[in-house]
Amino acid sequence: ALPVVKDFTAQVKERAVGTDVLKSLNPGQVFLKIVHEELQSVMGEANEKLNLATQPPAIVMMAGLQGAGKTTTVGKLAKYLAEREKKKVMVVSADVYRPAAIKQLETLANEVGAGFHPSTADEKPIDIAKGAIDAARRGAYDVLLVDTAGRLTVDEQMMGEIKDLHAAITPIETLFVVDAMTGQDAANTAKAFNDALPLTGVVLTKSDGDARGG
C-alpha cells in the first residue's frame, strides 16, 4: 500500500504546487478538487462491468479468506446479474471444509431465484466445479458463480488448491473478496492471492460497518 500512497501524494504535490487559483475559489477548494481527481484516478474513473463475453456459461470464481463474505457476495451477485443484467445464473459451492457454506448458498440461491448445483463435503472441489459447469451447459445458464473455500490465514495448501481449481475451470473473472475492516493486512492478503491467481477484480464487503475497523 505504501507505494500507492507515495505515488498519490507525489501526483497531488506536482499538480497543486504552482496551480493558479480562480477568483471564485480559494486555495483549499482547489487542493480538495485535485485530491478528489487523483483519488478517482487511483481507484478507477469509471465503473467496470463483469466481463461475461465468452461461450456460456461465463464462469466467475470467488476467492478470499474465511469470513470475508464470499458466499453472501455470490448470492448478491447472482441477484444483480439476474435482475439487472437479465442473465440466467447458477451458483455452486466448492467449499468442502465448511458444510454450512453449501447449505447457506442453497438458501441464498432459493431466495434470489438462481439455479443451485448441489455438492457435498465428500467431493473434491475440482470435481464439484466441473460437474456444475456440465449442469450449467445442459441447463443453458448464462453465468456460473463458483464459491470457494477460505482459510483464517493465507497458507500454501489453500493457495495450491485454489490455483489447481482455477487452472481446471479457467474462469473469465476471478474476484478477490476482502473484508473492509481487515485493515493494513488487506494489501498483503491481496498480494498473496494475486501472486497465486490472475485476479480480475476486487469485492469490498462490509463497507457499511465500523469506520474504525480499517
Show where each model-derived region lies.
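Conserved catalytic-core segment of NTP-binding enzymes
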Residues: 124-138, 151-214
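Conserved D-loop-proximal element of ABC-family nucleotide-binding domains
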Residues: 99-102, 154-156
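Primarily NTPase-proximal linker/entry elements flanking Walker-type ATP/GTP-binding cores
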Residues: 1-94, 101-122, 129-146
